[in-house]
Curated annotation (Swiss-Prot):
Keyword rRNA processing annotated: yes
Principal localisation: cytoplasm
Originating gene: rlmN
Biological classification of the source: Bacteria, Bacillati, Bacillota, Clostridia, Eubacteriales
Name of the protein described by the UniProt record: Probable dual-specificity RNA methyltransferase RlmN
Organism name: Heliobacterium modesticaldum (strain ATCC 51547 / Ice1)
Residues bound to [4Fe-4S] cluster: C146, C150, C153
Length: 385
């Protein structure tokens, strides 16, 4: 038997995924019908052969996307015969809650089982505010696993399984909302970050559709400026994102300031070197005039020296960026250390000395492995809250 080495397997996965994000000839496999991945007019078209009026599409859409119901039987203003037929069609596929954990800081992690048995994770982060309304952020997964194999990331270590459908992406927010409204009828997610499991730009079409569903005025109606999509540097995806007619935010997972180090920790850099990624990000800024967010995971003795800070600052000289420093989180089997507070503060001060708008990002949910780089979509080894 010819067994491929892990690096070779990762390269094959990356080549396969590359083909999916090229603007020309992107192919989407036919997906099973799931009402939560459809817009009102699409639901209406689906029901036209049943002799249903057009307004049924908007009616059902609001039940699903605004009220976050999980059962057709809950759509009480639909005719009974239609509810029965919809139920028999099997077009509503809510995520199956596998495990729920709550951190000391109030962060919640949800483990979901998909219809085919795959596991994904989502994170709910409530931020309490005294003067303004509370901010409630959900960190979303876009793939089961991830093909990019970033060395410091738990998701990358488990390999790539498949892309999530738009319904599965949207379903993470809808099913969290459904659960939370049992105790708080006014619960609402206000912000979204596509920073969970997977690379969003390797599932571009489904991410794009999900954003459209999230922002639809008859659904969750989340403001575009309250949504951030993060990429490890998929250049065609960045260019496509820049051409979108929206105000969704872009974040770049950078984590190193030179090609040698970045390729060592992020193999995707071999396909899209740093210069290409930065050129694409500059094109994004020139087209949109929207400030780029940059994520930088600090690893003790790896990329946390003052010379690293100066090199990082030089990459973005004259750019209106916001840089988040993220002291790396513990992931079993990786062997990287989180830097102490003092060198982290020195790194931050050096960046600011060179004119970079930078902060040390507040980390949430570390005690339940819900922080950056810790999501892994696994049922074993976790304790139920």
């Amino acid at each position: 038997m010819n067994v491929k080495e892990p690096a070779e397997e990762a390269a094959i996965q990356l080549r396969t995924e590359r083909q999916r994000i090229e603007p020309e000839g992107e192919e989407q496999s036919e997906q099973p019908t799931d009402l939560r991945g459809l817009f009102p007019e699409e639901i209406a078209a689906l029901l036209t052969p049943w002799g249903q009026p057009t307004f049924r599409g908007k009616q059902i859409f609001k039940w699903l996307q605004n009220r976050a119901v999980r059962e057709v039987a809950e759509m009480t203003d639909l005719p009974q015969a239609l509810r029965v037929r919809l139920g028999e069609a099997g077009w509503l596929k809510p995520l199956a809650p596998e495990r729920h954990r709550v951190a000391r800081d109030g962060t919640e992690k949800y483990l979901w089982r998909l219809a085919d048995g795959e596991l994904i994770e989502s994170v709910l982060m409530p931020y309490r505010r005294a003067q303004t309304r509370d901010r409630v952020t959900v960190c979303l997964s876009t793939q089961a696993g991830c093909p990019l194999s970033c060395r410091f990331c738990a998701t990358g270590r488990q390999g790539f399984r498949r892309n999530l459908t738009a319904a599965e992406i949207v379903g993470q927010v809808l099913d969290i909302t459904h659960e939370k409204r049992k105790d708080d009828p006014d619960f609402k997610v206000t912000n979204l970050v596509f920073m969970g499991m997977g690379e969003p730009f390797l599932n571009y079409d489904n991410v794009r559709r999900a954003i459209g569903l999230f922002t639809h005025p008859e659904g969750q109606a989340i403001g575009q400026r309250r949504i951030t999509v993060s990429t490890a540097g998929i250049v065609p995806g960045i260019d496509r994102f820049a051409d979108e007619d929206w105000e969704v935010n872009l974040a770049l997972s950078l984590h190193a300031a030179d090609d040698k180090q970045r390729s060592e920790w992020m193999p995707v850099n071999d396909r899209f070197p740093l210069a290409q990624v930065l050129e694409a990000c500059r094109r994004y800024w020139e087209k949109t005039r929207r400030r780029l967010s940059v994520e930088y995971a600090l690893m003790a003795g790896v990329n946390d020296r003052l010379e690293d800070a100066r090199r990082l600052a030089s990459l973005f000289k004259g750019w209106p960026i916001h840089l988040n420093l993220i002291p790396v989180n513990a992931v079993a089997g990786i062997g990287v250390r989180r830097p102490e507070r003092e060198p982290t503060e020195r790194f931050l001060a050096e960046l600011r000395r060179w004119g970079v708008d930078a902060v040390i990002r507040e980390e949430r949910g570390q005690d339940i492995e819900a922080a950056c780089g810790q999501l892994r979509g696994a049922a074993k080894g976790e304790e139920e809250a």
